[in-house]
Amino acid sequence: MTRLRKIMLEELQRRNYSEATIRYYIRKVEAFARHFQCSPDRLGPQHIREYQAYLFTKRKLSPGSVTTHLCALRFFYIQTLKKPWSIADTPYPKKNHRLPTILSQEEVAQLIDAASTPFHRTLLMTLYASGIRNAELTCLKIGDIDSRRMVIHIKGGKGRQDRDVMLSSKLLEELRSHWLRSRRKSSLWLFPGNRWHSGDQPIDTKTPRNACQEAARRAGIKKHVYPHVLRHCFATHLLEAGADLYTIQILLGHHDLKETAIYLHLSQRHLHATASPLDSLQLKVWSPQKE
């Protein structure tokens, strides 16, 4: 472990950051240093601005994704190295308020059926069946699956919140098959890392993302599909099936109901259940006027 990595790790742990956030922040700083092929303590705000432009123009990342990179870099330089920089030197990009991508239930089925491996199929099913975040998926442990109460325990989610999400009977059956397929039975992680999925560390967030992209390509789905899309689908399809917003808020782990209310804009059932005011007007049939 390098000196800088050790210092950053200790600072993150001292501030009680979650394991997922710690891994994420360290990876982002390492990627930044690799991009410039230079030790990060020799780089400055101008390099961060150049990197931000690279993430937008070359990597084609969204404003939200670029912001998470900047969060990690700000922590490293301002909190870890105590650089007297103003946050104005590295401003967050303005977010686009667009409605998220949604797949129909038929498209979700096509996506899952097109998974390139049984392991990828299980990842996609778990994301859609539970609505959990990609980072939460990668940190799942075997002991988090409660088949007696039919729930999945999410520990240390966003904001270090614990919560329970639903465990569908179909997903439980799939997870049991996944366990039987494993070459080396992990005693800890539900989805172990490395090539044979038998490592001592969990998969990283790239694995589910690659699973989504590969399955979408094989299924002929032209929409941009990534793990969070399946979370959006979970919430929208629940709403269309009659679930109330408050229940969905709890399952998603949202702090504010306003975050969950966006799915009202995506639900076809709610859109079609509301009549346009034009429909209530008593209009005459148009005919040309004689002069």
Locate predicted features:
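Conserved catalytic core of the tyrosine transesterase superfamily
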Residues: 1-291
